[in-house]
Amino acid sequence: FNRQPSNSSTGELDKEALSFNKDTYYVGFDANQGAELQGQMVLDYIKANAATIDRNGDGVIGYVLAIGDIGHNDSIARTRGVRSALGTGVDANGAVDSTPAGTNVDGSAKVVQDAKLDVGGKTYTIRELASQEMKNSAGATWDAATAGNAIGTWTASFGDQIDVVVSNNDGMGMSMFNAWAKDNKVPTFGYDANSDAVAAIAEGYGGTISQHADVQAYLTLRVLRNALDGVDVDTGIGTADEAGNCLTEGEDYRYSEEERSYYALNVAVTAENYQDFTDSTKVYDKVSKQLDSSKSPTKKVWLDIYNASDNFLSSTYQPLLENYDDLLNLKVDYIGGDGQTESNITNRLG
């Protein structure tokens, strides 16, 4: 769950891993759909605020981009989604290049391009001023502290040119927002709909994407529960169980048989609807009913959280898992990793 088996360079699915046995499935969210939503959210904001968003009036709407992990398929998709929507992406082997641009104040980088946007009879240039992978010295990616340091470096050099801040997730986005963007009234866009980011929308955070973590967490444990019970994998998902738990395909999730993957569908969270997302750890009402312990007896499960320091995984995903495990009669041992080495988790198996 959460990180789909894939090629770290291309993002191509590892179908061999996904077909390990009959009970192997992936649970996550629709990365491409969410990435497109984030990109469109940023573009819509720029169009709606074009007259005021160009802070120094140079006709260039400049943005900086915090990239979580250059080898992570979700990070790749989000970088591509933003660049595609804004028109700054360039083709690389049939897909938008997701390579960090480094510093690109003069627009000379090869992995991105300047785009043109016509709004209200005026033509603006959109430029990715800088982007980098937020990896710390210990090797941990999606690192919020590194993002906070990066925005400090960027603003010291070309702060008056930064009109928008974009991040592959809210952890990094909030770090940059709190370090600089909030005080300078620069809209910041993230991903995950973490509770602090949703609350910050009232203070100028531009928006975020809810990856329907409540549905993801349920699906993660439900697939496990069904495998342990030896019932059809769709039980309690697309087909109601005896308690009445059931999701709506096409609205709450989609299933790809070819990819053996369940994907929660994403929702854009902006100033118009953020109050509906203030409690990120609330179970989804459609699948909130307790299973009968006589038919689904308590089972012990070992579940690893590969990066326990990640804001989304620790503050949203794991609490949701913990809220669902009792409903599904699962006794779960949650093992937190460091986001760097597999042995940090596997060494605990003995």
Question: Each PLM stretch: what is its role?
Answer:
Residues 1-350:
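A residue-level marker of the well-folded mature domains of exported/periplasmic proteins
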